[in-house]
Amino acid sequence: PYTTLFRSATMADGSKKTVTGYTCSPTTMAANTTAVTVSYSEGGVTKTTTTPVTVTSISNTLASNSWATIRAVSDAGKGSNYWSVGDTKGITINGKVGATTFSNLAISVFILGFNHNASREGSNRIHFQIGKINGTLVGLVDGNYGNSTSTTGAFTMNTSYTNSGGWNNSHMRKTVLGSNSTSATSPAANTLLAALPADLRAVMKPATKYSDNTGGGSDTASYVTSTTDLLPLLSEFEYHGARTYANSAEKNYQAQYDYYKAGNSRVHYKHNATGTAAYAWCRSVTSGYDYRFCRVGTDGGAGTGYAYFSWALAPCFF
């Protein structure tokens, strides 16, 4: 394992020489290895140097790895060498999310794709979605599910009858999810981001997402712009691989997630009633209407909903 690490020696006259025949100790590295010692002898002279190392043990079972290890693999762009789309890892959601309190909700996150749409969204990222419970795709719901409400912190896209401001300025993005937070380690209070485990938040990366960020009922290409997000909802195209109701220009900047491209079900179920299918919000504005956003139907198909109705949440992170 050291053949590419130690290849040259500095001679007495200051010249450098490519060498072979050196020895290394230990000969193989384990998780508890903290240093490597290299020795080289020539002309009766032996020189020894010790180099500190950090060894990370990586399991092919995603759930067996710490979030720090997953981040290290992600940074190296090697996630697909170890894990597969759809692999899961459990987390606990705990705290107040908008106007709803979650008390140690056990839920699994799963891999949507590796280096998804990297040229636009950022490279060396593993995209995850929240989540699954006992293998069932779920969305988080609140007590207002299926109803209109102006309550701040309800799981609505906005607190009034409008999609003005699009995804960027939505109540969902800022007040409920905290996706616009400057840092995952300093999340806005009472948001879903703040309710995620600290070890996960410590390694989360932002991504550049494209969406209609104007709204107002016009299918205008220039309305599709970028935002920097930590915990966004998926777009219509990221779910379905086709545009039905969203701004027709969104698809030019987006890609369908591999998990859904593979044919996996898009039907979400309520996190607190996993036998009941739920409508789930998308971040895409419904073009042609100034008061709707896209959503995934209880049959898994594309649909739309009034901005001030409460539906399920299933955001992603990176």
Feature annotation, model-predicted:
Residues 58-318:
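Collagenous Gly-X-Y triple-helix signature in extracellular proteins
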Residues 15-47, 51:
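Serine/threonine-rich, repeat-prone extracellular segments and beta-strand-based repeat modules
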Residues 51-57:
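Interdomain boundary/hinge segments at the C-termini of tandem beta-sandwich modules
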Residues 7-12:
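Acidic, Ser/Thr
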Residues 2-5:
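Short, small-residue-biased leader/transition segments that mark boundaries at the very start
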